[in-house]
Amino acid sequence: MSTRQRYIFFLCAVLAISNFIFGGEQLYKKDKLYETGKVREFFGKDLRTIAFPIGGLGTGNITLGGRGEIRELEIFNRPNKGNYPDLTFFSIWVEEEGKKSVAKILERKLISPYVAWMGIPRNQLPGVSRFEEAIFKGEYPFGYLTLTDNEVPVAVRLEAYNPFIPLSPEKSGIPAAVFNWKIKNDKKSKVKVSIAFSMLNPIKTLDKNKRHSYGKNLNQFIDDGFIKGIKMTSNRGETEALESGSLAFVTTEKNIDVQTRWYRGGWWDNAHVFWDDFSDDGRIKNVSDSEESMEGRSDVATVLVHFELDPGEEKVIPFYLTWYFPNRENYWNREKEVRGKKFKNYYSLKFQNAWDVASYLIKNKEELYQDTKVFHDVLFHSTYPSYVIDAVSSQASSLKTNLVMRKDNGKFFGFEGLTDDSGCCPMNCTHVWNYEQTLAYLFPSLERSMRETDFLHNTFKNGYQVFRTLIPLGDYWWPFKPCADGQMGNIVRVYREWKLSGDTEWLKKLWPKVKAALEFAWKGVGDVDKKLIWQKERLLLPWDPDKDGVMEGEQHNTYDIEFYGPNTMTGSLYLAALKASVEMAEAVGDRKKSKEYLIIYEKGSKEYDSLLWNGEYYIQKVNVMEGLVVPEHLRSLEKDCENLSCKGKDSPGGKMGAPSKACLIQLVTL
């Protein structure tokens, strides 16, 4: 199977999850639904909230704003929303033959309202000229920006990306952002052009007062005969410190100017001196020596590429921003076993520093670019409606953010979501990650690593599966009740991973724990060691104690509540797990179990229809504990209880009592 064929296969699999758009009640006409259309383009005030993540799998990212600005540096192993990096920008100088030169920051002009506690920060250079308008188009993994301004005599476009190559997490896990500036001379005369990238060394380390601050930051100019650019580090702090690491920004162009540090002055002098120098003739004074910054200060460095364009000529100027911050810390858990524990990023096994990353990226740039482009073209040149392509591609971008991480043992982990400065709801939450499909189809080896963690570490012999993972892994677990939808969904996901890979040996390795997790539904906790007695406290009774294929016990679920009684939310996942296990048991030679699961599945399928289908939709039957007084506003009229059997104050005992006078109704439509 060719690379293109593989991408088409995975594309179809991923897009299959979007088929729901075409089902149900018809809200749009068919011609509108099936209209391919073009990818959305954003301009004007719509650019304000665009944040396009660029980074590798589990490496962190930078975000490119809709105006062309670098919005955030999220490269230090946690989110960093809303913190625009100081003095970090691209700029252009152009001189058309016989005319006055023009210099601008390569961004659209700022968008009102100009809100900040003391106005727009000076380190974002709000007073420096920018382009009149921008058009941003997101075709993940590529972000495309077009800048327009009548004062600028060249056409300016940006293509920004990070390698995104399905089936290759190694090539898709590079801590880098690539900026290809495409400059075209549409005039009839020659033009001179300079493109510069400036960046403040952003590394903050612990000072003598144990506060994160600048100090002893070092910017080094390196020309290794292959690439030229700046490597940024700090000489303050220990090698194993969380802040320890480096950045680099480089180019393959030969004609460059460089400054390892801007003028060291007070107030606004550094930016003022730089802009006067740059805007004068498109060149800057070369400063290539290295000198540590003072305590409490850091330095801005610049790499400038200068060139000429004949009429009609176009040139691509590449810049590569790379980073290397290998040390992570568990800041998100309160459990003493893991709180503050340190571990390393997977990319630290492949690279030694940010310059090493840049060298690898550029040596392999053609292959990495073309393979990324193939995936992009298969997706965006397909006949799926544009809104489906937009939804699927934009969601895939989550894999290139701090939502996920890859530990140095190769295992993959993910939060439920992100706040502005931290991960939210750790880690590998089984019911939330039930919704996720992209990883399994595009990077299946990483998805399989998550199943291995779920079953080989987080599932006990009795089948009790904890639904959050504590990392680093160890002889400790998150001591909460098991999650019915997450546990059953996880079994279905093992089935999915087995089907996608065809690796029955992998399935055999997981099968004992998969079987235990399924049968936990009717066996429950059982006898456990003293150190696991908390399991009995978390779940008193099994989900399906009479083994009839219907869950009616306490079912913790993704709504962070408990269901009591039969329902098709957890019930459908239970049936799916049974059906999947019928086939998996057969594949591993466990035919007796295969037959047993099939009997339970068929019984449960009939029972759910019999109990919950009212002729129009499925309802939920809520088993109310004996003696519990149901609030008046939740009581139904007695005549509404005809399809409902609840354990209420006046109902007899048994699993499903007779209709109650105090009967709680909850309708769930599918």
What is the predicted function of each stretch?
Residues 40-85, 282-300, 306, 313, ...:
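Substrate-binding groove/exosite segments of carbohydrate-active enzymes
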Residues 57-124, 227, 240-284, 345-348, ...:
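Acidic-aromatic substrate-binding/catalytic surfaces of carbohydrate-active enzymes
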Residues 112-176, 266-303:
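Extended, loop-rich substrate-binding clefts of extracytoplasmic carbohydrate-active enzymes
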Residues 147, 158-160, 195-199, 313-325:
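Short, hydrophobic/aromatic-enriched beta-strand segments in well-ordered soluble domains
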Residues 158, 163-280, 328-330, 334-382:
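Polysaccharide-binding surfaces and accessory modules of carbohydrate-active proteins
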Residues 184-185, 190, 497-508, 580-598:
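Inter-helical turn/loop segments and adjacent helix faces that build the functional surface
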Residues 548-549, 553-588, 596-604:
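Hydrophobic, small-residue-rich alpha-helical packing segments that form membrane-like cores
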Residues 582-588, 600-670:
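Carbohydrate-active enzyme catalytic cores, enriched for enzymes
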